[in-house]
A protein has these predicted regions:
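Catalytic phosphate/metal-binding cores of nucleic-acid and nucleotide-processing enzymes, i.e., regions
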Residues: 1-118
Length: 118
């Protein structure tokens, strides 16, 4: 099992939707920037040749954002894993499942625990 921490708050679904509503380029720019930020941490992971399961542990600094909006950011994380060459694809053949847990702390972050399955 591999574990990494992304030590900052990722955009929520509402934030992403608001960017996309501005114009098609704003949403794409946001995603590109988030992918680059996440990529630094994703590059510490090995390449996965077998399917994986991921546990996302979300730490939020306050209770303002709905949990479903928070965990939307897994889309950014999985896309970054594919872009970095850590996963061949993020479809069901390669990502067999995931779960989410949440807590509140001093600073926002997400901790990933990734397990290869056969």
């Amino acid at each position: 099992m591999n574990k990494i921490e992304i030590p900052f708050r990722l955009p929520s679904l509402n934030q992403y939707i608001n960017e996309c509503r501005k114009n098609k380029f704003a949403g794409a720019k946001m995603k590109k920037n988030v992918d680059a930020d996440i990529g630094y941490f994703i590059n510490k992971l090995p390449k996965y040749n077998n399917p994986i399961k991921i546990h996302f542990h979300w730490v939020e600094e306050n209770k303002r954002r709905d949990l479903d909006n928070v965990c939307f950011a897994k889309k950014f994380i999985l896309d970054s894993m594919v872009k970095a060459g850590k996963l061949k694809d993020d479809n069901r053949n390669y990502v067999k499942g995931f779960n989410d847990t949440f807590e509140y702390g001093k600073t926002s972050k997400v901790i990933l625990e990734i397990e290869e399955v056969k």
